[in-house]
């Protein structure tokens, strides 16, 4: 029916090798098979050995240089999160390399393992073949290009079985080991490609929000969001977009959230309202904060989690191989699981925005200016926003594995194998897997990066890289000097990586963060200018200061009625560390407020 057979793919690969080796490879048929002599390395021309080694060395070095170049570009552009993700990819490739080496050097010992023949006929992925029919077919068929012997990576020659005892067979054959070796190779290639596509689609989606962010600096935006104007809650754009009579009915509530993720996952009103809510809760109202760049940094932090392969995911990979039994329909289950997870996560994220809109209508009948959304971890499953990211991680891994598995079967067994009784259905499953990739990368993952900002905690990516490192270094210096004591006052009380009250000043750039008393679940910061501190720029990188910078830390806390004393300030001009300040009420602190 016009479908390319998997043998054609193998022939194209062999043709490329034939061209590279100068045409020294010939086609072996069943009639000439007995005349073929399998020569060892000491009987192989040195030019052939050198040519093959040169080919693999050049390809390996080029790949290594490519990864090194990508890492250098990310380092120069201060893309720390993406650089960490690249290191994770390298680590996963190294794990796959170790698996390949173990398969190569352990093949001799694995082939010595014998098991009873009746055990070898259990849990087969394909129906057991008719031995008599198989012998007849083998006598009439010709060998494929270069015969099947060309596929042995480490065995060189299909050695006869060593299980001489009657009723015993090999645990796994040399050809099966080689096919498993090819699967590892496919996993490495598709893991890199899949990770690249996931990140690129996510960044492409968030880049589309840039013109909304630029709009917040215009005079039209200031006029449209006039804080002195009163409006009915149900007349605001955000509430009208997410609420109606049907949203009060649970069934229609989730049906509407399900379909909204496909057509208008994030609109202009959603972005501006969530941006306003984030700044009002975590920063000083009216701050010139580049929310779009912050979301992009947050997405890069999430990508570090998504790109890795944890032991749990390796366990799911082994479980799939174990349960892929004839008649169990494991391949259909493996295709359906990622679809269900991604659709459920997308529906949940849309439901969170709708619940925030309903919360506005329940709290207020009239709002002043733009409606203020109040996020909370209780909106998420089990109160854990990070659980959604782990679910997407599992779904993306399973989806990538299904695509890899399809191409591996196509290459190793062809399009008419027992794995794919109907090749058209297999193509439909691959199309669904690609659709899940686009849906998760372009819609769900950016939506997650946006909605999770409405949680109870602020992510550390709100700080640029330089400020975050400086605050961490200051914190470690304080712990080293004073030790860990119950009465020690630390920046960020819970020991998190993002301090909650600080003022960082430098000779090269001045960045001040002042703490104000707000609602029990929120912190507000003032004076954080990401346009000057954000390192995530598209076309320029920061240059280090010519002279060693000096930092000055001032912590200002609103005075209690019982506090007395004077404010002291310690400055160290010859050190990059920060000095801890013990605040006390004074006239100066009153004026700062």
UniProtKB/Swiss-Prot annotation:
<keyword id="KW-1133">Transmembrane helix</keyword>
<comment type="similarity">
    <text>Belongs to the MLO family.</text>
</comment>
<feature type="topological domain" description="Extracellular">
    <location>
        <position position="326"/>
    </location>
</feature>
<feature type="transmembrane region" description="Helical; Name=6">
    <location>
        <begin position="394"/>
        <end position="414"/>
    </location>
</feature>
<dbReference type="GO" id="GO:0005516">
    <property type="term" value="F:calmodulin binding"/>
</dbReference>
<feature type="topological domain" description="Cytoplasmic">
    <location>
        <begin position="68"/>
        <end position="92"/>
    </location>
</feature>
<feature type="topological domain" description="Extracellular">
    <location>
        <begin position="1"/>
        <end position="46"/>
    </location>
</feature>
<feature type="transmembrane region" description="Helical; Name=3">
    <location>
        <begin position="182"/>
        <end position="202"/>
    </location>
</feature>
<feature type="compositionally biased region" description="Acidic residues">
    <location>
        <begin position="528"/>
        <end position="539"/>
    </location>
</feature>
<protein>
    <recommendedName>
        <fullName>MLO-like protein 8</fullName>
    </recommendedName>
</protein>
<feature type="compositionally biased region" description="Basic and acidic residues">
    <location>
        <begin position="567"/>
        <end position="579"/>
    </location>
</feature>
<keyword id="KW-0812">Transmembrane</keyword>
<feature type="topological domain" description="Cytoplasmic">
    <location>
        <begin position="348"/>
        <end position="393"/>
    </location>
</feature>
<feature type="topological domain" description="Cytoplasmic">
    <location>
        <begin position="452"/>
        <end position="593"/>
    </location>
</feature>
<keyword id="KW-0568">Pathogenesis-related protein</keyword>
<keyword id="KW-0611">Plant defense</keyword>
<feature type="topological domain" description="Cytoplasmic">
    <location>
        <begin position="203"/>
        <end position="304"/>
    </location>
</feature>
<feature type="transmembrane region" description="Helical; Name=4">
    <location>
        <begin position="305"/>
        <end position="325"/>
    </location>
</feature>
<feature type="transmembrane region" description="Helical; Name=7">
    <location>
        <begin position="431"/>
        <end position="451"/>
    </location>
</feature>
<feature type="region of interest" description="Disordered">
    <location>
        <begin position="481"/>
        <end position="593"/>
    </location>
</feature>
<dbReference type="GO" id="GO:0005886">
    <property type="term" value="C:plasma membrane"/>
</dbReference>
<feature type="topological domain" description="Extracellular">
    <location>
        <begin position="415"/>
        <end position="430"/>
    </location>
</feature>
<keyword id="KW-0112">Calmodulin-binding</keyword>
<dbReference type="Pfam" id="PF03094">
    <property type="entry name" value="Mlo"/>
</dbReference>
<dbReference type="InterPro" id="IPR004326">
    <property type="entry name" value="Mlo"/>
</dbReference>
<feature type="topological domain" description="Extracellular">
    <location>
        <begin position="114"/>
        <end position="181"/>
    </location>
</feature>
<feature type="transmembrane region" description="Helical; Name=5">
    <location>
        <begin position="327"/>
        <end position="347"/>
    </location>
</feature>
<feature type="transmembrane region" description="Helical; Name=2">
    <location>
        <begin position="93"/>
        <end position="113"/>
    </location>
</feature>
<keyword id="KW-0472">Membrane</keyword>
<dbReference type="GO" id="GO:0006952">
    <property type="term" value="P:defense response"/>
</dbReference>
<feature type="transmembrane region" description="Helical; Name=1">
    <location>
        <begin position="47"/>
        <end position="67"/>
    </location>
</feature>
<feature type="region of interest" description="Calmodulin-binding">
    <location>
        <begin position="465"/>
        <end position="486"/>
    </location>
</feature>
<feature type="compositionally biased region" description="Low complexity">
    <location>
        <begin position="489"/>
        <end position="512"/>
    </location>
</feature>
<comment type="function">
    <text>May be involved in modulation of pathogen defense and leaf cell death. Activity seems to be regulated by Ca(2+)-dependent calmodulin binding and seems not to require heterotrimeric G proteins.</text>
</comment>
């Amino acid at each position: 029916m016009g479908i390319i057979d998997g043998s054609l793919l193998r022939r194209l690969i062999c043709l490329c090798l034939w061209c590279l080796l100068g045409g020294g490879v010939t086609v072996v048929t069943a009639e000439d098979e007995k005349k073929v002599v399998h020569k060892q390395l000491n009987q192989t021309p040195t030019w052939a050995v050198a040519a093959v080694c040169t080919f693999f060395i050049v390809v390996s070095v080029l790949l290594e240089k490519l990864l090194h170049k990508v890492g250098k570009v990310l380092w120069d552009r201060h893309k720390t999160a993406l650089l960490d993700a690249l290191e994770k990819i390298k680590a996963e490739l190294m794990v796959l390399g170790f698996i390949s080496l173990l398969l190569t050097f352990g093949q001799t010992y694995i082939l010595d393992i014998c098991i009873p023949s009746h055990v070898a006929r259990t849990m087969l992925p394909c129906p057991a073949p008719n031995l008599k029919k198989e012998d007849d077919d083998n006598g009439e068929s010709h060998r494929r290009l270069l015969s099947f012997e060309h596929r042995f990576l480490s065995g060189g020659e299909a050695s006869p079985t060593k299980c001489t005892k009657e009723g015993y067979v090999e645990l796994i054959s040399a050809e099966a080991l080689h096919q498993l070796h090819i699967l590892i190779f496919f996993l490495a290639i598709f893991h890199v490609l899949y990770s690249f596509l996931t990140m690129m689609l996510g960044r492409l989606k968030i880049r589309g929000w840039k013109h909304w962010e630029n709009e917040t600096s215009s005079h039209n935006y200031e006029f449209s969001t006039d804080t002195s104007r009163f409006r009915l809650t149900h007349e605001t754009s955000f509430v009208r977009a997410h609420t109606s009579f049907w949203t009060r009915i649970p069934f229609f509530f989730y049906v509407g959230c399900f379909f909204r993720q496909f057509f208008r996952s994030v609109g202009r009103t959603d972005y501006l309202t969530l941006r306003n809510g984030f700044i009002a809760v975590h920063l000083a109202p009216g701050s010139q904060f580049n929310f779009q760049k912050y979301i992009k940094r947050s997405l890069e932090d999430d990508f570090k989690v998504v790109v890795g392969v944890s032991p749990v995911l390796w366990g799911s990979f082994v479980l799939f191989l174990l349960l892929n039994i004839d008649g169990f329909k494991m391949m259909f289950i493996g295709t359906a699981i990622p679809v269900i997870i991604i659709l459920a996560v997308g529906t949940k994220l849309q439901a969170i925005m709708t619940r925030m809109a309903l919360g506005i209508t329940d709290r207020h009948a009239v709002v002043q200016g733009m409606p203020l959304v109040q996020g909370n971890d209780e909106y998420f499953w089990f109160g854990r926003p990070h659980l959604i990211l782990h679910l997407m991680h599992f779904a993306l891994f399973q989806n990538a594995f299904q695509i890899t598995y399809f191409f591996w079967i196509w290459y190793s067994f062809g399009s008419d194998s027992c794995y794919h009784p109907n090749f058209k259905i297999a193509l439909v499953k691959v199309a669904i897997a690609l659709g899940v990739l686009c849906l998760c990368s372009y819609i769900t993952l950016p939506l997650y990066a946006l909605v999770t900002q409405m949680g109870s905690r602020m992510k550390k990516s709100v700080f640029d890289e330089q400020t975050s490192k400086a605050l961490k270094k200051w914190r470690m210096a304080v712990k080293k000097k004073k030790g860990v004591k119950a009465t020690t006052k630390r920046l960020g009380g819970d020991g998190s990586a993002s301090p909650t009250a600080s003022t960082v000043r430098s000779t090269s750039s001045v960045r001040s963060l002042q703490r104000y008393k707000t609602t029990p679940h929120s912190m507000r910061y003032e004076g954080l200018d990401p346009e000057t501190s954000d390192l995530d720029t598209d076309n320029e990188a920061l240059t280090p200061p010519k002279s060693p910078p000096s930092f000055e830390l001032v912590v200002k806390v609103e005075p209690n009625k019982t506090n007395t004393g004077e404010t002291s300030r310690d400055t160290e001009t010859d050190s990059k560390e920060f000095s801890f300040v013990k605040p006390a009420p004074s006239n100066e602190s009153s004026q700062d407020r």
